[in-house]
From Swiss-Prot:
This is Multidrug resistance protein MdtA. GO terms for molecular function: efflux transmembrane transporter activity. Residues 399-415 have a biased composition (Basic and acidic residues). Keywords: Cell inner membrane, Cell membrane, Membrane, Signal, Transport. Part of a tripartite efflux system composed of MdtA, MdtB and MdtC. It comes from Escherichia coli (strain SMS-3-5 / SECEC).
């Protein structure tokens, strides 16, 4: 019984497998028949279709720009640091207790403005003593002069000897010298008193105070009371390669001030504009550069001491220069070249001689003329004599608008 039961299951399995195999065989024959006419038709059409594809294949899309003629400024650039025109550490010239500060931190002050006061009591006393001594010696001098006048009369009658007259004359001269010393002492005491009132030596901005009211200060303090930086005007010190020195000197000989621009770290924003002040008198042998100083009015306080900026100095303007976008300029084994478009939108390679250039544009001194069209994008797909399709650059805004329009269209189709 068990053997017959197993035999029946084996027969069932074999029948199922055979049925599946027959189904797949039949399905494959139908697919082959349906595909054969289409393949034959495609084979019949392929020679002509291939030739048409070769004749009318899609043109390589490129972007182009026209070479223009314009005046191009020539700049020398360098990295620099803003420095104050003057930096002064305000220190006391006398010793004493700091009684008052008359400025706000960060305040702009003028030369002569009162900044601080030191206790003047001791200096007033010293001045009074000097004045008293001067008055005393003046009285002594007046008496000595009267005695001298009497001696001069008495010597004529031999009532006073010539020696006594000479002694009196010496006393008068000595007292006159004492008076001069007393006057100097008075002036010194007055000066000490004046110095107890500390004033700004230059115009500028005061920094943070270095000492508080009530502290004892002296003329030997190195930190001082406050530091003043003169920022109106303010200077920029930057470096240029030694190869640019001749260009700067030649531009200076033209007699016009050289304009220097200060730009931020990213070179995206112009901070201020000034003029060249001077060149250093020697080249740094280590770096092969020379220091250059420019001065800025800085009334808007756009520049700040110790600020790092990019300097651009205008040294010349090239008139009637042929200019193209920098993206069009390429470099090959033969040198610099550009792809030029003719009236039929066919490209040809032109060797060129570049001049002044930056990230946006380049001057072409030889190789093309104003009005020539040059390829600026799609250059990697070009070959000599190839015909191309000139397309306009698509802005990011336009791309977003088109994408949005397609999205709305899809939503409309779904709804």
């Amino acid at each position: 019984m068990k053997g017959s039961y197993k035999s029946r299951w084996v027969i069932v399995i074999v029948v199922v497998i055979a049925a599946i195999a027959a189904f797949w065989f039949w399905q494959g024959r139908n697919d082959s028949r349906s595909a054969a006419p289409g393949a034959t038709k495609q084979a019949q059409q392929s020679p002509a279709g291939g030739r048409r594809g070769m004749r009318s294949g899609p043109l390589a899309p490129v972007q182009a720009a026209t070479a223009v003629e314009q005046a191009v400024p020539r700049y020398l650039t360098g990295l620099g640091t803003i420095t104050a025109a003057n930096t002064v550490t305000v220190r006391s010239r006398v010793d004493g207790q700091l009684m008052a500060l008359h400025f706000q931190e960060g305040q702009q002050v003028k030369a002569g403005d009162l900044l601080a006061e030191i206790d003047p009591s001791q200096f007033k006393v010293a001045l009074a003593q000097a004045l008293g001594q001067l008055a005393k010696d003046k009285a002594t001098l007046a008496n000595a002069r009267r005695d001298l006048a009497r001696y001069q009369q008495l010597v004529k009658t031999n009532l006073v000897s010539r020696q006594e007259l000479d002694a009196q004359q010496a006393l008068v001269s000595e007292t006159e010298g004492t008076i001069k010393a007393d006057e100097a002492s008075v002036a010194s005491a007055q000066l000490q008193l004046d110095w107890s009132r500390i004033t700004a030596p230059v115009d500028g901005r005061v920094g943070l105070k270095q000492v508080d009211v009530g502290n004892q200060i002296s003329s030997g303090d190195t930190t001082g009371i406050v530091v003043i930086t003169q920022t109106h005007p303010i200077d920029l010190v930057f470096t240029l390669p030694e190869s640019d020195i001749a260009t700067v000197v030649q531009a200076q000989k033209a007699g016009k001030p050289l304009v220097v621009e200060a730009w931020d770290r990213t070179n995206s924003k112009k901070l201020s504009e000034g003029t060249l002040l001077s060149l250093d008198n020697q080249i740094d042998a280590t770096t092969g550069t020379i220091k250059v100083k420019a001065r800025f009015n800085n009334q808007d306080d756009a520049l700040f001491p110790n600020q790092f900026v990019n300097a651009r100095m205008l040294v010349d303007t090239e008139q009637n220069a042929v200019v193209i976008p920098t993206a069009a300029l390429q470099m090959g084994n033969e040198g610099h070249f550009v792809w030029v478009l003719n009236s039929e939108n066919k490209v040809s390679k032109h060797l060129v001689t570049p001049g002044i250039q930056d990230s946006q544009r380049v001057v072409i001194r030889a190789g093309i003329s104003a009005g020539d069209r040059v390829v600026t994008d799609g250059i990697d797909r070009l070959t000599e004599g190839a015909k191309v399709e000139v397309v306009e650059a698509q802005s990011a805004t336009t791309s977003e608008e088109k994408a949005t329009s397609r999205e709305y269209a899809k939503k409309g189709a779904r709804s």
